[in-house]
Amino acid sequence: EWKELIQFSKKLKIKFYVDVFGLKGIQDISKLKIDGVKIHSTDLNNPKLLKFATKLKIPILLSTAGCTLSEIDYAVTTLSKNELILMHSFQGYPTEIKDLNLKRILALKEKFALPIGLMDHVSGDSKLSMIVPLLGIGLGVEIIEKHITLDRSKKGLDYFSALNPNEFLLLVALIKKSQLAMGKQSFELGKNELQYRILHKKNA
């Protein structure tokens, strides 16, 4: 079943990441041709799992939800030779807005100088479920984790923070536009800015 899903994702040109729990989980997925793995925050101080993870040649996402700075530092140090992305989150379903603490993204970037991602578990039926990921883009995250379900009204497994397919497509489009809007830090003027200067700039 895993191999079929991986092959299907490759046909669609979608990267295939796996969320693992425990040593056996990461040992099992190491035999698969996947694009990356996420280590759950409950395993961030699992020395056997982390030692095994050092052998992986794929990107590793580290969930930092509910972890202290020293725990994150331990995992980052252990996996210092791996390609790491730190994932900020609050491990609650659904996450209350007051618990999001998005500014911690900036603290993680400053402390570890690594790419940062955001795992968003805000209630799927809240308008903020579309806004929080965009705030993450504004804070410089490079990966967004968002759950999807075929029909949230059926209240199946993991429906709390999941989006319906049409909502998910809309969010992807909004994320792409937000990334475009972020632009560059350069002060080099673009075509439209130059045109504005020609038409409206006043000189003494």
Where are the model-predicted features located?
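Catalytic cores and adjacent flexible loops of soluble metabolic enzymes
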Residues: 1-204
